[in-house]
Amino acid sequence: EGDEERTLVASQRIKEEGLEDLVTVKLMDYRDLHKSGLTFDRVVSVGMVEHVGHANIPLFFKNVDSVLKEGGLFLLHNITNLVEVEGNKWITKYIFPGGYIPTLREEITVAADLNFHVLDVESLRLHYMKTLQEWVKNFEAHLDEERKMFDERFLRMWHIYLCSCAAAFHYWDIDIHQTLYSKGINNTLPLTRSYMYED
């Protein structure tokens, strides 16, 4: 599923829910946000910052800053490392060329330089470990179909990747966090997370 298809699916779901007047989906390169002339109350990034590369993390945050209104919220959902390391050479070579898994410390330091304030941080490590374990089961259950699309070398590589990532989350080599920032001061959110679970 490509970016264009995901954009269409998201737009269709928004329409089905009758939210067209409230929500718009835009397919854009993060490096072009500052040129867009757009402003948002909220920005959400899911699993994207890992793909910009270590050197571009400040640029990523600057572009979010350029479109987020004062007091606006920025939710960053991404895989994180415990310490600053180059990353797994095998994964960097075969799975995510140019990728880099940042630490919370790196992200928060860059964010603070731009007047972003941390409102909440949640680890979803165990959730993602279970997700990866289910992906492994699903992958193994559909090998006959996958063999029609990919060669054995790729299938072995992908299987190793999924299993090793599940193990990395299990043994806390890596984590996955949702970090909620405000641009400047935002004192409007409830004091606890309970509002997130209300209908």
Q: Model-found features: residue ranges?
A:
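Class I SAM-dependent methyltransferase SAM/SAH-binding core
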Residues: 1-33
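ATP-dependent adenylate-handling active sites, centered on carboxylate activation for C-N bond formation
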Residues: 19, 38, 181
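A short acidic, Gly/Pro-enriched loop at the edge of an enzyme's catalytic core
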Residues: 31-43
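Serine-hydrolase catalytic core recognition
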Residues: 39, 60, 76-78, 84
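A conserved beta-strand element that flanks and buttresses the S-adenosyl-L-methionine
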Residues: 44-49
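A short glycine-rich, Lys/Arg-flanked "PGG" loop and its adjoining helix->strand segment in the class I
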Residues: 58-73
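Substrate-binding/catalytic lobe of Class I Rossmann-like enzymes that use SAM or dcSAM, i.e.
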Residues: 79-189, 196-199
